Each structure stands twice: as structure tokens, then as C-alpha cells.
Amino acid sequence: MQIFLVLALCGLAAAVPSEDRKLSDKATTLADRSTTLAFNLYHAMAKDKNMENILLSPVVVASSLGLVSLGGKATTASQAKAVLSADKLNDDYVHSGLSELLNEVSNSTARNVTWKIGNRLYGPASINFADDFVKNSKKHYNYEHSKINFRDKRSALKSINEWAAQTTDGKLPEVTKDVEKTDGALIVNAMFFKPHWDEKFHHKMVDNRGFMVTRSYTVGVPMMHRTGLYNYYDDEAEKLQVVEMPLAHKLSSMIFIMPNHVEPLERVEKLLNREQLKTWASKMKKRSVAISLPKVVLEVSHDLQKHLADLGLTEAIDKTKADLSKISGKKDLYLSNVFHAAALEWDTDGNPYDADIYGREEMRNPKLFYADHPFIFMIKDSKTNSILFIGRLVRPKGDKMRDEL
């Protein structure tokens, strides 16, 4: 039997929880496990020599693993939990914890960001979804169930891509151009995220600059500039800079990690783990920083199947071993693809800034953070301490400017 599962997470937060509402131990635990997943999966992907830009939402990938666990049995289910470092937790704990975490972090109203997330399950015309699976998957991961005829591949792909575009208000026009295997389960995450800065960039402080993809290849990008007080650390030993920019409502922030000079990110990526992030955070101090960032319109679609397999999800993707029988009651499904598609934009938009700050002593002699070459970034949620997105910008959109020798 063939089934096509399109998973993203749209409208998970139906109500706005109070900012001081305490998370349950379940949600806190799953937030912690999703952070571990963030670094594990990022490193697995960064090993791919053909990979350029990376854009992941660890909490959304965690929900995909939760869904595999929900629809699987025996080792198929336990491996999904193990990749999430949740194999010691019972099923109800995992599903309810993820549900609460996702409802919290996807509350874009409370966080004053734009986060479009959608959720759909496609199956063939012949499938009968198990009632318990439909009920529990909707309860915990909030997605609809639909059927699709993949005998007409062109029409099916068009339907999936149009759904993704509609879900993201046209920001994500395409999830995939093709699906090679059409006899297995297909997971697709589709989302659009746009941060709203705590202090905006002035719209007139934008000009065209060069972004050095490599020392010999430069593209033109719109670069925006502002000076403000930010948490900042200059790691002289590792020859890199770390800066944290709060987003509106200060419930989340963007962290940028950039080597001092243009170079492959491999050296910096080898340093990247949660303990190193804590170390950098402990050394950051609020000070004046002159920041130049490219305006970003980033659209990335990853097939995570291989990378999740590298982390231990091997049985669900094996046609001869997978047991996803809780989805339909039949043991003839396997996971053929895990597409994780996201669009990310940031520009000058944000809250008004206090112009009086520029006369203060503390604003003198700002540090320079000039992001004109590849860097790593994270979007971190302050309440749950989870990483909403992790990625790297290696090749932004832009026309080639020149070759350099």
C-alpha cells in the first residue's frame, strides 16, 4: 500500500497562553531533547559535502519523529523515540510533552513573529486510516487527513506543492520536484518564519553590498545596518564572533555565529554543541555593536531520510522491516522520504527604537559585526529554552558580482 504523509504544523496554538504560565515537566523535558536533536541533526547534515544552506526547525522535526512513533510499533516506534533521546520515556509522556511544547512555541501572537505552519496527511484512495491514529495525531500534532492519487505523479506533486504554497502564503512555492519512491510513507514539513526585531533597522540604512560565498565568488545582496546594544562575544582564541539580537516581545532571539574571515564553516561547526553555546552565552556582554546583516529570503527543502537514518532511524525507512501498522492497521508501509521545507525571511521590520540611546557613553566605540560571508544562525525561544530554528547561510540569493584571485 502506498501512503503519502505531508506533515507540517499549522495553527498549533489556538489560544494565547499567559507569558508567566509555567510549562509542565513533560514539555520542558521534550524541549531539552529537541535541543539535543538540533545539534545532532545539524552535524549529520553538515557532513554532506553537497549541502550549502541549511534551515531546520528541530521542534518540527521532533514532531515528525513523534508521529512516526505514534504510527509505528515495536522497533520502528522505539527508534523514532531514540533519535529524539526519548526512548526512556513512555508514549503518553512524549506525545503530550511535544504537543504542549509545539503549542507554546508556535504561538506567534505572543511572540510577535510570523510563523506559518501547516499539517496534512496524504494517503492513497484505498487507504482506511485507523480511527485511533486519526484522533491522536490530530490531538497531538494537529493535522488533517486527505487522499491523493499518485498514479498521476505530476498532478500529485502539483497538489502537494500548491498546498505548501497556500500554507505559507506563497513563501514556499515548491517542496519537491519529484518523488522517486511512490510506495511508501512521505513526510513533508512546510513552514514560513519571519522574525520581528525588538529594535528595527532603519529602512533607509540599506544598500547593495557583496557577500563572499567563497574568496573567489561574491554575490550582491541588500545589506541592512544598525548600531545598538546587544549581547556580544569576541572569541579571539577561535577567531569568531557571537551576537544575540532579541526579537519583539523578547520571548525569543536570533543568535549569529560567524568566523572573523571568509572560510568554510567546517572549523566553526566542529565547535558547535550545546555546551559550547552555553560557554559563549556566559561570556557575552551587552555592549554597543554595529551590525550589518544581509536581508534574507531563504527557501530550503531538505530530504532528511538519510540524515535521520544516520542518527538511528533505520527500520522505518526499510521496506522489509518497517512496522507503521498503527496508521492504517496494515503492516505494509515504510518511510520513503522525509522532506523538511522552510522559508525564512528577515528584513528591517521591528519595534521603534529609542533614538536617545545614541548620545550615551556606552554607545561609543562599537564592535563591528559585518556579516558579508557565511555564518551560522539560531532562533532560540527564551521561555522553553528550545531552538526553534538552526541553520547556516552560505549562498544567499543574489547575482554574481565578480571573481577574485
From Swiss-Prot:
Signal peptide, first to last residue: 1-15
Chain span(s) of sequence motif Prevents secretion from ER: 402-405
An annotated GO cellular component: endoplasmic reticulum
BP GO terms, sorted: collagen fibril organization
Gene Ontology MF term list: collagen binding; serine-type endopeptidase inhibitor activity
InterPro entries: Serpin_CS, Serpin_dom, Serpin_fam, Serpin_H1_serpin_dom, Serpin_sf, Serpin_sf_1, Serpin_sf_2
Keywords of this entry: Chaperone, Endoplasmic reticulum, Glycoprotein, Signal, Stress response
Superkingdom classification of source: Eukaryota
Subcellular locations according to the entry: Endoplasmic reticulum lumen
Induction: By heat shock.
Site note Reactive bond homolog, residues: R364, N365
Residues glycosylated per entry: N107, N112
Chief location: endoplasmic reticulum
SUPFAM superfamilies tied to this protein: Serpins
CDD domains documented for this protein: serpinH1_CBP1
Purpose of the protein: Binds specifically to collagen. Could be involved as a chaperone in the biosynthetic pathway of collagen.
Family statement drawn from the similarity comment of this UniProt entry: Belongs to the serpin family.
Name of the protein in its database record: Serpin H1
Species in which this protein is naturally found: Gallus gallus (Chicken)
